[in-house]
Amino acid sequence: VLCVQGSCPLLVVEQIGQRPLWAQSLELPGPAMQPLPTGAFPEEVTEETPVQSENEPKVLDPEGDLLCIAKTFSYLRESGWYWGSITASEARQHLQKMPEGTFLVRDSTHPSYLFTLSVKTTRGPTNVRIEYADSSFRLDSNCLSRPRILAFPDVVSLVQHYVASCTADTRSDSPDPAPTPALPVSKPDAPGDPVLPIPVATAVHLKLVQPFVRRSSARSLQHLCRLVINRLVTDVDCLPLPRRMADYLRQYPFQL
């Protein structure tokens, strides 16, 4: 996972056989492609696909957005590692002495974002905004890398996905383990904060390992048991449990 600070976010994806975006942008244009003559493939029948206009306004669903955000807040409050409206400086103080990979979720101080993911890295605490659009949450990125970033129905699902990915890479016994999922770069959380460009060579490996639980949000024994059950069972409905207990498990179907 590479995290780079700068005025424009840069998403670096390191995969076998795949080149980073900046390398693709430096390629010289090749020879122009000549169109095939008509009837070159008589057995193929092409169908015209209607092209949707980019200027066509998207259909908004305020009720769906409200339900999605309310569900996310409910999950975060149950998690114990949602710190609410603390600032970036306060998050830095909490994570400064924690081991690498410790993270928390807090409210973003930027008016265009709801949440921010604060993570302890090898270079210190780093902040990554979480953007919301079309009833989905994803890590903040620029326009070019946005199609590569996965979207999730809530923030806890997003965090759990990257924690599982980093854990799988850590446990890999292969001599050349696959690169961890690329997370977008850190940005200043408040508008107007100074941005110092950092070259790609000084990129920071950003990994998510364990959440930093608030002391004031000490998780109950019931919740801890629920986490263990969620880690061991994929489908709660298959368990012979009373309805009340099954409903409690469904209220927080996560492992963190």
Swiss-Prot record:
Disulfide bonds: none annotated. Residues 168-190 are annotated as: Disordered. GO terms for cellular component: plasma membrane. PROSITE patterns: SH2, SOCS. InterPro entries: CIS_SH2, SH2, SH2_dom_sf, SOCS_box, SOCS_box-like_dom_sf. Pathway: Protein modification; protein ubiquitination. GO terms for molecular function: cytokine receptor binding. Keywords: Growth regulation, SH2 domain, Signal transduction inhibitor, Ubl conjugation pathway. Residues 207-255 form the SOCS box domain. One of its GO terms (biological process) is negative regulation of receptor signaling pathway via JAK-STAT. Residues 81-162 form the SH2 domain. Stably associated with the tyrosine-phosphorylated IL3 receptor beta chain and tyrosine-phosphorylated EPO receptor (EPOR). SOCS family proteins form part of a classical negative feedback system that regulates cytokine signal transduction. CIS is involved in the negative regulation of cytokines that signal through the JAK-STAT5 pathway such as erythropoietin, prolactin and interleukin 3 (IL3) receptor. Inhibits STAT5 trans-activation by suppressing its tyrosine phosphorylation. May be a substrate recognition component of a SCF-like ECS (Elongin BC-CUL2/5-SOCS-box protein) E3 ubiquitin-protein ligase complex which mediates the ubiquitination and subsequent proteasomal degradation of target proteins. PANTHER family: CYTOKINE-INDUCIBLE SH2-CONTAINING PROTEIN, PHOSPHATIDYLINOSITOL 3-KINASE REGULATORY SUBUNIT. This is Cytokine-inducible SH2-containing protein. It comes from Rattus norvegicus. The lineage of its organism: Eukaryota, Metazoa, Chordata, Craniata, Vertebrata.
